[in-house]
């Protein structure tokens, strides 16, 4: 039967009412924020029921290979690795961040591109202390370590 959704991404179709509706529906987190790479609390929409915001990073999205002909798997991989290296360095220096990848089977999952994702994960696994997880787990972890 599956699992109910715990988070929500409207892409560009959210309104001023989206977060309130998500809170009323019992969602744990919202992703329609493109402002950074650290989760935070929305304590203003419904002050008595804060909502975790897990930012979405459009620049790491594999959709770039679909919409920008100049962004092939080589360029996507180079960008993703540079992004990871910077975020990792900031974490080692005591300022941990998250990096998200928006991935689509119809794009990165194609035979001519999947190698780039495999190479990216080889690069990530070569670094100590990296947590590869879901956005739901990030939201749950954030709520535990930074209670509202």
Question: What is the role of each PLM region?
Answer:
Residues 3-95:
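Active-site-adjacent pocket scaffolds in enzyme catalytic domains
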Residues 29, 81-148:
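C-terminal domain-boundary segment and adjacent tail
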Residues 2-6, 103-106:
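A broad detector of the eukaryotic-type serine/threonine protein kinase catalytic domain
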